[in-house]
Amino acid sequence: MTSASADRTTRAALSRNRNFTLLWSSKLTSDCGFSAASIALPLLVLAVNGSAADTGFVLGTVATAQLAAGVPAGALADRWNRKLIMLGCEAAQAIAGASLLAAILLHALTIAQVVVVAAAFGVCAAMFDPAEDAALPTVVPDEQVPKAVAMNAARASLAHLSGTGAGGFLFAIGRVVPFAADMVSHAAAFTGLLFLRIPPREAAAQPPGQLHREMLEGLRWVWQQRTIRVTALCAVVLNLFFSAFYIVVIVLAHRRGVPAGQIGLMAAMLGAGGVVGALLAPYLQTKLSPFISIASVFWALTALTPVALVIRNGYLMGALFFGIALLPPTANTTITSRQLLNTPDHLRGRLTGVVGLAAGIAGAVGPMLGGTLTQLISGSQAVLVCAAGMAAITVVVTASPTLRRFPRHEPTESSEPPVAALKP
């Protein structure tokens, strides 16, 4: 945070930070609606024409749009007014939800419209995140950024947990209900963000260039930062194999006759573990070194994933998922807070866009890998393949001198270090 930003920001507890509270609560409201709509969209497609192919296409559209817009969104967050970007995203999602609501009520819904709405949801999600992340260090003091990052992680897990549970329930009440709730949630978030005050950014030294050049500049800068590069690559590999493992476990549980209700509980426990882990993250971050907080996630997943081979009860698997989800928020808090505080303000949006793209690729390829493994080999063998992949990257993380020297951030008057300090 610049000294000017610090002068504008109170150093009271985050709960009494007006701007952070507005940003956090608005995004929570928005994310709950988005999660509910994300569950309701495939159910709506199935209700319209019963096509599993169309259902998969709609879900793929959300993910594809989010991936495709990620890097451009980061560049735009460094170029445009970040508050206006967030407001525009909420307004667009409210309008998209309203269009579905109207089409359902008028019996005029088409799959093409659902695809367009899904694309709008994906693009808006990609646009909002870099703008919010880049603005975060300007609305909270440097020393509170780690706690703010942890609270944002808890918010995401809580919204996913509550929204996905509510989506199916609301759709059972009526087809229009989840989309009405989604529209209201985005309208409420838009209203809250209207009152958000973000300190003005310093004038750019040079006028904005061509967008594609700014995107390449962001990619180049992120790649040149050794710590960011190593942590991102290791996280991508781990997320890829865990996403595959998650699908494998769901399929394995189904083959073993685990009731659908217990399988749903397994997924819910993963989200619940994420919420609890995010709440514990600020405390754990003060007790663990950065390297231990990061490496412990890899060690824990490597040790716990093979346990799935001997579990045949959905409740016990849910407990395993809960335990697996406890430590990642601490590592994410350590990594994200340092990245934000040590990245120049004019590059923070592109940082988030690039890192989000990498995470999105892992999240998209991982389930496909898991599904392919369950088709080619037995479920138990697929678990072992995923565990082996996690073990391999764990060895790399444990031996990495870059991660072993991962520095603990010490807040300074300015979070924008000199250019020389940004070079690896």
Predicted regions and their residues:
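Alpha-helical transmembrane-bundle signature of multi-pass membrane transport and export proteins
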Residues: 1-424
